[in-house]
Amino acid sequence: MGEVGPQEAQSASSTPGAPGRGRGTPARSRYLLAVLLVVAVIVASLAWVVSSPVGSSPDEDFHVGSMWCPPPVDETGCQISTKDGEKAVMVPQSLAKEYVTCYAFDHDNSAQCALNASDEELAPTLRWDDGNYPWGYYQFAHLFVQHSTNRAVLALRAFNALLAIGLLGAIIALADSGLRRAISVALTVAWLPMGFYFITGMNPSSWAMTGTFAFASALLASTRSEGRRRAGLIACALAGAVLACTSRGDSAFFLFVITVALAFAVPLSRRIVPEACLSCVASAVGIWVMSRTNVAASHLASGSDVSGESWWRIVYLNVSALPNYLRGFVGYLFGPGWNDVSYQGTVSSGASLVVVALLAWSLRSLSWRKVLSAITVAGAITGVPVVIGLRGHFNNVLVYQPRYMLPLFAVFMLMLLAPSPARDEGGRSLGSRPFRVPQGVAGRVGTGLVAAVWALTNARALYLVIERYAFGHTAHGMPIDLSTRNLSDGNEWWWPNAPVGPMTVWVVGALAGFVAIALAAYLWGGVTRERLQDH
């Protein structure tokens, strides 16, 4: 591909919502649509926030215990007790393991049993952080503690969702138009549906996913920006690094993986010294944080031991399990909750179709920089679980769940989708080449179908989560099943004194998702339409 001229470079780095020349979409209309898009995203996110009860995400009994009693527990005012001869902390009864996870793993039971616990009484729990996680997330989450455990957890979930929308929205707004579209497409596709579930939860994985992607996308965008935009993007990258380093040890390590990937993606020059310094410092801090936490060690302590097998047999077991492991990013075999919400069928198939469509589209504009940066991230995604399995002498990809590597999936998509940098007359990087969406009748129909599948998959994923906890597990046909019921008719669980019922939440959340993807698809194609009109 040849270099673009200065006029195209200027267009590529134009301000958000800038009108196209001649008959382009007016800036005012573009801004109004962008605002409506943000509102739709917020509404859809809040529907995910309230879709499941307290304790519903993996190991949430541990996370709520750590939220109430962050380390060091001896200095934070928590009441210390014992349970089964071990040191325990006192938490509201509704957060004790036997109550908050009373429905976990039991597909047939709703979350009704969780309503029997009291916020007034205290109970001991052995589930609290004693060095497995970095300092930061639990200390911040403790600020949300209040008398009502439901309100505390919902407030934290809502904050995490709004934090992701605010930080990533700022990056998208500050990035040049070509890269802005690539960033939004990457996270929209890679986070369907599991990413949305974790981002809107109280699990530290929320910060891990937001921080990891913010660090990667903001750093990449800042290398193609100038002035205040560049400064703002560097600040966003720093914020992402802080989130990654204060949430999980593995997400802190991901900063190093991203730094290596960006070294391939971004041409070296004196101009990127600030970004290079930030990425190197963040990588060093991330490795240090990971070395001081015990998350990786805790994974190695459990699993299907195959120590009696040969080394090559263990390699085979790990590598052969990778296809199912990777499909876990879209909920296959590893759905929400304590893996007790099944996404096999419609949801995992629909999300897989969207991912495959975007991967196929990205192949039309590959470059050696894209390939090497994507291989770097893909190597970490597949290599880390396999190496852990080999070191632990068991097929660890069945234990080291896909959600641990999910933060890197959106980064992988971004490395493939990001357009090449544009250059001005002096050869200096200035913005990005346009992000091209499929054109022509077939291209537009295909784009519309992919967007429709995305909206349908998101709606179905939200429905299944609500149904699981409101009614218990319901058998659905395979591989495609769109059967629904009135979620407010006979439901056994819902938030006490909630102003709206589960059916209203699902309908509003699903419609908001439809509106959001429709507006996003229209705005993504804006630059291409304008350029076609100019010729």
Predicted regions and their residues:
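Short acidic/glycine- and proline-prone juxtamembrane loop motifs at membrane-interface regions
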Residues: 200-208
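Membrane-lumen/periplasm interface segments of multi-pass, membrane-embedded glycan/lipid transferases
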Residues: 288-365, 484-512
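Transmembrane-helix motifs of polytopic, lipid-linked glycan transferases
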Residues: 155-178
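Membrane-interface helix-loop-helix junctions at transmembrane boundaries of multi-pass membrane enzymes
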Residues: 176-179, 268-275, 357-379, 530-534
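Transmembrane helical bundles and short interhelical boundary loops of multi-pass, membrane-embedded
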Residues: 265-266, 287, 298-307, 438-535
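Perimembrane helix-loop-helix junctions
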Residues: 221-226, 231-232, 252-283
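Interfacial juxtamembrane loops and adjacent helix segments
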Residues: 72-150
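Short hydrophobic alpha-helices at membrane interfaces in multi-pass membrane enzymes
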Residues: 224-243, 247
